[in-house]
Amino acid sequence: VGLLLKEGARASNITKIITELNDRLLRKILEIAERKFGKPPVAYCWVAFGSEGRKEQTFKTDQDNALIFADPETAEQEDAAGRYFAEFTAFVRESLLRCGFPPCPADYMASNARWRQPLRVWKKYLASWVSTPMPEALMHAVTFFDFRPVYGEAALAEELRTSLIGLLRDQKVFLGHMANLVVKNTPPIGFFKSFVVEKDGAHKDELNLKVKGIAPLVDIIRLFALERGVRETSTLERITALRGAHTIVQEYADEFENAFEFIMLLRIHHQYEQISDGRTPDNFINPNELSNLEKRSIKDAFQLITKAQDLIIERYKSMIW
């Protein structure tokens, strides 16, 4: 990664390489698990979500995964699948932990019985979240809707994606609730284009690039992708797919791409320097340590986020509170 940074590689190329390496490691662990526990009773697909699902991983990442398995034909087969995948996913979780991937703090992992289910149950989950967009359902939606098949029967994940696209067709109420979430996370820039930083604590005078920079862009583009039934999960691939299909993206596609690439690259540089110094990587930077060009570029990115959020408020004005 250090060599790629020196050569001026784009952030998206670096995150793709990191994701590919992580995917290969995960697939190897899953192959070992299959040898250890034998052939599964039914076909399954291991899916990643969050930054892993979007292929946007940096150095600091935890386990965000789930398991979809084919609908069992009998009660006996369902029991066998339940027992098999309980042991299987526990082994994978511990193996990933030993390889340096900590468990998800919110327990969004296949080792949690709630997140390893047959396809029919997953379809019910999605239908429930979309039809009743309460806060918990929206939290699950934001987490899971970036799911990507990593190993196994990818057709199971593709069928679930098709089901989700169908559920969201003309679902203005759910999309309105999602829009409401999207516009609440405003970028850290004040009225006079000054940075809004942490006022106290361990990160005093710093700002969180992930929460206040990357996340708003990811959320904005995800909303637009859900509006148009886009199958892609990565932010940049979604922007490409939306260029000819969404009026806001048509107008600001290049700006969205540049803003995302810039903030992500700033984050990767920051984390690489921390690791090189023997420190734990985080997402906090002190804007006073940025060059004038970097300050200008990040302010432009934050202003773009504000502009997009204003357009979303206009689009969903009766549903924003």
Which residues does each PLM region occupy?
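A nucleotide- and high-energy phosphate-metabolite-utilizing enzyme signature
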Residues: V1-W321
